[in-house]
């Protein structure tokens, strides 16, 4: 078993020879790796040449399915350190005292791109962190934007498909992209779309961007008191973004620019760090909001729900093997610890299943046995979870395949009092999704964002330009829907987008006429 995640980042598998004698996969020493058995010097090969077959057969199977989405990513190890007491909010052991450190792994990623795509393209960024706590592993599976495109989980596969390739041309498709987003019931995405097409949609590197839970979570203290919580992870390096021209140029010259930047910064001792904050809200406060506390397309006003500092994340160790420690890392919102729970946010509820299930497909049902995913700080014991492909942890030996009453098992009881009525839900089982036509409340925060961009030189202009350049690739009918949607934010913005799109179209016509 690997010692990954302990005092030193090591890959030290027991089946790897320390004397570095080269063998085939069964441990048989190889005299010469590049010879093949054949009849004479120029005759056909022999099927009995197992070393050749062993090598080729493994080569055919060495790739695993890529993530869908978040395929292109980078990662590093580090630690989380508590700087402020929040035990009145959360009873998790990782927050138990100031100065306490917890080992962690963070993976950054783009969302829509393939594994080999550029990491400077316009796209949200994933910001996932696995904490190896003494109460089990905890995954914060976040993004670099505080909101998202949808609030109905059933739309997630459809939305992700629009961010990928046309099934006929295998090309990115502006019609698909904007057709989905401008459908009336999907225009709740407007806030996220504006963040995406501002310069914040092209971060300069992974070190210089924030992370957000987006979702509302439910945290409890050891007295049983609970709050709704959102988490903000603020970069200590300062926000740095690229313009569309800079991002496009870098994508063409170095598609792994952000990955290289992260690796080299850590390698050179320039360890990136982020300060972790939380926003908290009582159930009573939630009922007073003009929107649902479970609406993933909305932010909580910081004037009303101020940020409260918690601690710091520092990344100071590069992976020793990318495949073993980053590609095989499995993050899921369902991976949680005592006192940190999911809320009734419907998209979060759906992610509780879908993320872990994606890892079962991508890595196999025993993905938790892969060293990078092992809860090494708390260990694992449940003899009913056993067998299956690639079970390599001893399979609990002679333990019964069920939890037997006559065995001396230990069950840990949480310290907090059991509250029977923390949340009360009462109603019929119904088919439901949010309002089919977004109301004015769904555009308020987008308008506020546009005003904020107006205080930053050139940012409103860049937003209009970035949208106009992209929407020009869509058909005229969809273009008009885009203009109409942004007119609900600001008529001047809508007109500026249209002007950019028309200018780009005219320029392309002029260029084509020269040939």
Curated annotation (Swiss-Prot):
Cellular component, GO, one term: cytoplasm
Note: This is one of two catalases in S.cerevisiae; the other is catalase T, which is the cytoplasmic form. Present with 623 molecules/cell in log phase SD medium.
EC supergroup of this enzyme: oxidoreductase
Gene3D superfamilies: Catalase core domain
Taxonomic source organism: Saccharomyces cerevisiae (strain ATCC 204508 / S288c)
Family annotation (Pfam families): Catalase, Catalase-rel
Motif extent (Microbody targeting signal): 513-515
Residue sites binding heme per the record: 355
UniProt subunit comment: Homotetramer.
Its job: Catalyzes the degradation of hydrogen peroxide (H(2)O(2)) generated by peroxisomal oxidases to water and oxygen, thereby protecting cells from the toxic effects of hydrogen peroxide.
GO molecular function: catalase activity; heme binding; metal ion binding
Protein name in the entry: Peroxisomal catalase A
EC number of the protein: 1.11.1.6
Chain positions found as N-acetylserine: 2
Protein's cellular compartments: Peroxisome matrix
Main subcellular localisation: other
Known catalytic reactions: 2 H2O2 = O2 + 2 H2O
Keyword list, A-Z: Acetylation, Heme, Hydrogen peroxide, Iron, Metal-binding, Oxidoreductase, Peroxidase, Peroxisome
Known cofactor(s): heme
Family matches, as InterPro entries: Catalase, Catalase_AS, Catalase_clade1/3, Catalase_core, Catalase_haem_BS, Catalase_immune_responsive, Catalase_sf
Family to which this protein belongs: Belongs to the catalase family.
Swiss-Prot/TrEMBL GO biological process terms: hydrogen peroxide catabolic process; response to hydrogen peroxide; response to reactive oxygen species
């Amino acid at each position: 078993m690997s010692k990954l995640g302990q005092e030193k980042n090591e890959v030290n598998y027991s089946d790897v020879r320390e004397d570095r004698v080269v063998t085939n996969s069964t441990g048989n020493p190889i005299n010469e790796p590049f010879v093949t058995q054949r009849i004479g010097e120029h005759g056909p090969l022999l099927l009995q040449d197992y070393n050749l077959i062993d090598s080729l057969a493994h080569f055919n199977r060495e790739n695993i399915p890529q993530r869908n989405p978040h395929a292109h990513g980078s990662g590093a190890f580090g630690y989380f350190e508590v700087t402020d007491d929040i035990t009145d909010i959360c009873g998790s052991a990782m927050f138990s005292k100031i100065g306490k450190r917890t080992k962690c792994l963070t993976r950054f990623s783009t969302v829509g791109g393939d594994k080999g795509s550029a990491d400077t393209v316009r796209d949200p960024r994933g910001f996932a962190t696995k904490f190896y706590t003494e109460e089990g592993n905890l995954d914060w599976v976040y993004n670099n934007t505080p909101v998202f495109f949808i609030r109905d989980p059933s739309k997630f596969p459809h939305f992700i498909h629009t961010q990928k390739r046309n099934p006929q041309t295998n090309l990115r498709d502006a019609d698909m992209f904007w057709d989905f987003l401008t459908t009336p019931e999907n225009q709740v995405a407007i806030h996220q779309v504006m963040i995406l097409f501002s310069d914040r949609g092209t971060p300069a590197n992974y070190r210089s961007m924030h992370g957000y839970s987006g979702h509302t979570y439910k945290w409890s203290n050891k007295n049983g008191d609970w709050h709704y919580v959102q988490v903000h992870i603020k970069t200590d390096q300062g926000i740095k973004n690229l313009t569309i021209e800079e991002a496009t140029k870098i994508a063409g010259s170095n598609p792994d620019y952000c990955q290289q930047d992260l690796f080299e910064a850590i390698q050179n001792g320039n360890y990136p760090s982020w300060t972790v904050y939380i926003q908290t809200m009582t159930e009573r406060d939630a009922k007073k909001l003009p929107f649902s506390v479970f609406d993933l397309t909305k932010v909580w006003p910081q004037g009303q729900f101020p940020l409260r500092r918690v601690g710091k994340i520092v990344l100071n160790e590069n992976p020793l093997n990318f495949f073993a420690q980053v590609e095989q890392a499995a993050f899921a919102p369902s991976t949680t610890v005592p006192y940190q729970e999911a809320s009734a946010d419907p998209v979060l509820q759906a992610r509780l299943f879908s993320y872990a299930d994606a890892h079962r497909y991508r890595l196999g049902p025993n993905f938790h046995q892969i060293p990078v995913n092992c809860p090494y700080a708390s260990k694992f014991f449940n003899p009913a979870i056993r067998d299956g492909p690639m079970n390599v942890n001893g399979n609990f030996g002679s333990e019964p395949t069920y939890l037997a009453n006559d065995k001396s098992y230990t069950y840990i009881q949480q310290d907090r009092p059991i509250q029977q009525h923390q949340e009360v839900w009462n109603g019929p089982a119904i088919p439901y999704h949010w309002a089919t036509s977004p109301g004015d409340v769904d555009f308020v925060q987008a308008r506020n964002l546009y005003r904020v961009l107006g205080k930053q030189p050139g940012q409103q202009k860049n937003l209009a330009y970035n949208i106009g350049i992209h929407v020009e690739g869509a058909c005229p009918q969809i273009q008009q829907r885009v203009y109409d949607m942004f007119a609900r934010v600001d008529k001047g913005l809508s007109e500026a987008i249209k002007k950019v799109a028309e200018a780009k179209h005219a320029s392309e016509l002029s260029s084509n006429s020269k040939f």
